[in-house]
């Protein structure tokens, strides 16, 4: 008689979360790599992340992805954190170990860089980059962006003090990479950037693009970390000003591939899954 063990259980936690494509992506990764997992969405009350995390772990959960607005909470509640998590104060990937510890990683920036450099074919080395936002999404991508050695990264946020704090947390890394890293007011962040990355939820909330049109020039890569309809406003704005728009679908798949590798020890074929997912939209 043959017995089959239950699959390891994972989920994505957020608020909102119903739009997430992560369950399909991870199911496809598992199929292509021969892994047995179950992966679901979990809508978490805004004041209930710690309880949801504890309940999921107690029920035998193996790990979870964390999306807005809980990435800072995920970093704070973890037992162990990677260097990227410690710098950012934000985590998007949690692993629950048999000894009861929770390990935090942040794969957002790795996914963003892979999508820009590999999938979009845009080099970041020596470029001027504007990062719009200083919340968990922005914090999670700054170190991997610095690792690409751009000429300059400007962080612009509505609350300038938050941008300053994010810059300060990465000042040593910027110096070691010889990158100019600065925080400027969101209304006056500079002009003519090579790459503009929207790490705010302005598109998701239906709000206006929070930076002036002059941040763009002809051919600027304008990247919204959201995807699908949530990114449409930003992408329309970019296209209208001669920039090259790109949504965050590739980042989603690439960061998921990094998370899958953390959990399963296998790197799935992200490019294939991205192509398949793009065809569905």
From Swiss-Prot:
The protein's name in its UniProt record: Shikimate dehydrogenase (NADP(+))
Documented EC number(s): 1.1.1.25
Alphabetical GO biological process terms: amino acid biosynthetic process; aromatic amino acid family biosynthetic process; chorismate biosynthetic process; shikimate metabolic process
Any single GO CC term annotated in Swiss-Prot or TrEMBL for this entry: cytosol
Pathway recorded for this protein: Metabolic intermediate biosynthesis; chorismate biosynthesis; chorismate from D-erythrose 4-phosphate and phosphoenolpyruvate: step 4/7
Record's function text: Involved in the biosynthesis of the chorismate, which leads to the biosynthesis of aromatic amino acids. Catalyzes the reversible NADPH linked reduction of 3-dehydroshikimate (DHSA) to yield shikimate (SA).
InterPro entries, per database record: Aminoacid_DH-like_N_sf, NAD(P)-bd_dom_sf, SDH_C, Shikimate_DH, Shikimate_DH-bd_N, Shikimate_DH_fam, Shikm_DH/Glu-tRNA_Rdtase
Positions with a binding annotation for shikimate: 20-22, 67, 92, 108, 227
Subunit structure: Homodimer.
Stored Pfam families: SDH_C (PF18317), Shikimate_DH (PF01488), Shikimate_dh_N (PF08501)
Record keywords: Amino-acid biosynthesis, Aromatic amino acid biosynthesis, NADP, Oxidoreductase
Gene3D superfamilies: Leucine Dehydrogenase, chain A, domain 1, NAD(P)-binding Rossmann-like Domain
Active-site residues, record numbering mapped to chain: 71
GO molecular function annotations of the record: NADP binding; shikimate 3-dehydrogenase (NADP+) activity
